[in-house]
Amino acid sequence: MEAFRTHTGIGVPLRRSNVDTDQIIPAVYLKRVTRTGFEDGLFAAWRNDPSFVLNQPPFDQGSVLVTGPDFGTGSSREHAVWALMDFGFRVVISSRFADIFRGNAGKAGLLAAEVTQDDVELLWKVIEQHPGTEITVNLQDRSVTAGTVMVPFTIDDYTAWRLLEGLDDIGLTLRKLDEIEDFETHRPSWKPRTLPA
């Protein structure tokens, strides 16, 4: 997983709340056996509407999604995070995330930055008044900057550390590879093995 320090990209105002994972990516798109190629399913029902924000330039090139509260509710779908990332998003900003979505996002490298609802409204105002406004999200100092507006965001320290280090679950495990190999070499030969003999 790529380490995350800062990201600058076009802000996209998604003026919707209670966006569940089935709205992010409908179940029909979950049949794939790969982890990529889900961008066509992102907000599929809404993208049929030509006036939907992601169908409008310059928002169709955005990489920082600013959305209403309760984003990512519903079932646990890693595919929802993958669809957002495959479309090009690196950051989602909201005043409240579903816990399971927040966890899946952090494990995949998507930053879920939590701000106050007043700050969401302020960011929406800036990017709607000036389409194409670039938003810079700095994980190290936990700030969001859009033009002259700067707001703080919150994220738990553990997830921030994983993102800063670029550590997914496999990366975390591989940090302990020496200890794993040492354990395996000292296991009695009659026990099952995970490493070749």
Curated annotation (Swiss-Prot):
InterPro entries: 3-IsopropMal_deHydase_ssu, Aconitase/3IPM_dehydase_swvl, AconitaseA/IPMdHydase_ssu_swvl, IPMI_Swivel, LeuD. Belongs to the LeuD family. LeuD type 1 subfamily. The gene is leuD. Its EC number is 4.2.1.33. The keyword Kinase does not apply. GO terms for molecular function: 3-isopropylmalate dehydratase activity. Keywords: Amino-acid biosynthesis, Branched-chain amino acid biosynthesis, Leucine biosynthesis, Lyase. It catalyses: (2R,3S)-3-isopropylmalate = (2S)-2-isopropylmalate. It is an enzyme of class 4 (lyase). This is 3-isopropylmalate dehydratase small subunit. It comes from Mycolicibacterium gilvum (strain PYR-GCK) (Mycobacterium gilvum (strain PYR-GCK)).
